Curated annotation (Swiss-Prot):
The gene is rnhB. Pfam families: RNase_HII. This is Ribonuclease HII. Belongs to the RNase HII family. Residues 1-190 form the RNase H type-2 domain.
Length: 190
């Protein structure tokens, strides 16, 4: 069985990233013992530790993303689904079942699926995927922060904090900002 989740859906900057994990049934209790839970409920340090440990407990995993041009072209919801589909397709063995975080199943994946609203809080498989996706995306955004100073990306990871919005108003959007997400911030400085 596999779980898949995405991160970065609400960010102003950077791609939406997804991870899929294929976990043997006998390893599920081990994930719980490790402290796997929704990535948003973990400190950055604990997330990183779990992301390093998870490959030893899962059969395999895949990480993928949808970039800003794709988000602009198809919308964030469809880009999130695309990133999750790509992550599942990167698994070397196709699972019998996929638990998908959210309200949608993956339209281009022909296998048994279940959409689980709030799945990152309800399923250890989805939680494990959320951890891998979050750490991968946070690492990417931290690296990109050096190329784009002035937006406080290393701290906000691309989300719309006050400092990030201030940077957008002061410097404008970079090519990795999501124009549809940033337009109102830039046009309406209040």
């Amino acid at each position: 069985m596999a779980g898949v989740d995405e991160v970065g859906r609400g960010a102003l900057f950077g791609p939406v990233v997804a991870a899929a994990v294929l976990v043997p049934i006998e390893a599920i209790n081990q994930l719980q013992a490790l402290g796997v839970k929704d990535s948003k409920q973990l400190s950055p340090q604990h997330r990183s530790q779990l992301a390093q440990a998870l490959p030893d407990y899962v059969h395999s995993y895949g990480i993928s993303f949808a970039d800003v041009p794709t988000i602009n072209r198809v919308n964030i919801r469809q880009a999130s689904l695309l990133a999750m589909e790509r992550a599942v397709q990167k698994l070397p063995v196709m699972p019998a079942w996929v638990l998908v975080d959210g309200r949608d199943t993956l339209p281009h994946i022909a296998m048994a699926q279940m959409a689980v609203t709030g799945g990152d809080r309800k399923s250890l498989l989805i939680s494990a995927a959320s951890i891998l996706a979050k750490v991968w995306r946070d690492t990417l955004i931290t690296r990109l922060a050096e190329r784009f100073p002035g937006y406080d990306l290393a701290s906000n990871k691309g989300y719309g904090t006050a400092k990030h919005r201030q940077g957008l108003r002061q410097y404008g959007a970079t090519p990795l900002h999501r124009p549809l997400f940033c337009r109102k911030i830039i046009e309406n400085p209040d």
